[in-house]
Amino acid sequence: GKQNQVTVAAMVFDAYKALEKLSKHPSIDKDKISITGWSLGGGVTLFSAWKPIIEALGQSVNFASHLAFYPPCFFDFEEMCFSDSPIHILIGELDDWTPAKPCDEFVKKLAKSNVNITIYENSHHGFDREGELEFNENGYSFKDCMFDVNTDGDILMNYLNIPMTNPFLQKIGFLFCVERGVTIGGNKNARNKSFKFAKDFMHKTLSQSKKIN
């Protein structure tokens, strides 16, 4: 796809612009708006909970909860400071596109009661699909990647520590660690469990939500 033609920062900005718009709608409770995303969208879901970026955007409204399906977690934040809103990651044990291990380590490192993870056994990227497993020879595998994120929100290239502030630099930065070729496909058990979890998570976090920083 064309996912490397836009930066994560730009997508998070868009997410908060959408939140601002929704929060002004007379039929919507601004304190009961959640964000969820899949794969790269899951990364946006996580980054939208990072306090430095929330503060930099000068946000007056926040997401009530964050539910990320198989997000990229291969980021080492200089400032591990995240929202107190409920944050949950759903990811497959065998994911070779956005690996589960960095997500598990992220949750353990953050060590906050509102941040949790569910890892589905024998499941790959796209476990909530109905299709069979298939190999995508063009997909980026980030299993050997770990990018530093400084306090300004810049994602830095491996080794060079150059901020990937535009799509071109981001594409160059990926070349230092990514490999081509990933597996994607559904797992019926994981799909059913994740759908039920998502429904329960949204019901719980939105029915009980209150303004959280």
Spans of features found by a protein language model:
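C-terminal catalytic histidine-bearing segment of alpha/beta-hydrolase fold enzymes
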Residues: N114-N213
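Cap/lid segment of the alpha/beta-hydrolase catalytic domain
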Residues: G1-A10, S48-I53, N136, G173-R180
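Primarily recognizes the serine-hydrolase "nucleophile elbow" in alpha/beta-hydrolase
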Residues: V6-D84, L94-W97, K101
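Hydrophobic pocket-lining residues that define ligand/cofactor binding sites across diverse proteins
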Residues: L22, P26, L110, M202
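Hydrophobic anchor at the start of a short beta-strand
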Residues: I33, I87, N114-I117
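Short beta-strand/loop motif that positions the catalytic acidic residue
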Residues: I89-I91
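Conserved loop-alpha-helix segment in the C-terminal half of the alpha/beta-hydrolase fold
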Residues: C103-K112
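Charged catalytic carboxylate motif
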Residues: D14, P102, K193, F197
